[in-house]
Amino acid sequence: MTDIFSAIQRTAIRIKDAIDTKDIGYSQQENSSGETQLQLDIKCDMIIEEEFSHVTSIHTIASEEKEREVILHKDGRYFIAYDPLDGSSLIDVNLSVGSIFGIYEGAFGAKNMVASCYVVFGPRVEMVFAHNKTKLHLLQGKEFEFVKEIRLNEKGKLNAPGGTQQNWKPYHKKMVDSFFNEGYRLRYSGGMVPDLHQILLKGGGLFSYPSTSDKPDGKLRKLFEVFPFAFIFNRAGGEAIDGAVDLMNLEYAHIHDTSPCFFGSKYEIQRVREVYASNQ
């Protein structure tokens, strides 16, 4: 696991340099979702694959930018699914973006996840790595230094509601509004990594990306985004569900499979359970 952690640190340093200097214009290529890729998406994907290719413990990688997984080392034991640059469309307005890594042992799947990591590229570069605990690291020069363990409070203060509001179900909108009526503050940038990072570092709250009329199975991908953050929130004392079921109990049909998802402190997630149970 140490070799993987070190490789992720190297990718973070190289991606930071790419963000600072790389052309962010559109390429002529499309990713697995049919979206035109930015030059920076392609560059970051190449950086990660290159660094992981040197780690013999990694058997297979799957990138959010590619249709199929890639076998690196047949004798490896770890399978890594990653989003090279989540929120890359925010680069041109200079908002924070991030990389997400789900580390699985033996095969992909939530029940095989053994560690998870994400990197935030903002005014500072920070890395959160979850194995037995959820730990924050800060890039200082060319080295990451441990800062602290992250623990969520029982109840938070932030509300980050995703998805187009006109496509929300009425009871979901009512629930979101109820948190604001309790004094919760809106924190939503359109980037999953910085929004969830803020909830983790500020002690708690709720991030939601529900089933909507245009995306009934949710938008966020299980292997690349949903499972990794569910693992992190669970290790930090929070919870993560699809509206009813613990996200870490979900299966996946293919590597780009999606799910509705809710991440937060115990208080907020219990509210989600109650609201969704009474509206099924």
From Swiss-Prot:
Keywords attached to this entry: Carbohydrate metabolism, Cytoplasm, Hydrolase, Magnesium, Metal-binding
EC identifiers of the protein: 3.1.3.11
Gene Ontology MF terms in the entry: fructose 1,6-bisphosphate 1-phosphatase activity; magnesium ion binding
Organism listed in the record: Sulfurimonas denitrificans (strain ATCC 33889 / DSM 1251) (Thiomicrospira denitrificans (strain ATCC 33889 / DSM 1251))
Catalytically driven reaction(s): beta-D-fructose 1,6-bisphosphate + H2O = beta-D-fructose 6-phosphate + phosphate
Annotated binding of Mg(2+) 2, by residue: D83, D86, E225
Gene responsible for this protein: fbp
Gene3D superfamilies: 3.40.190.80, Fructose-1,6-Bisphosphatase, subunit A, domain 1
Primary location: cytoplasm
HAMAP family on file: FBPase_class1
Family per similarity comment: Belongs to the FBPase class 1 family.
Name recorded for this polypeptide: Fructose-1,6-bisphosphatase class 1
GO annotation, cellular component aspect: cytosol
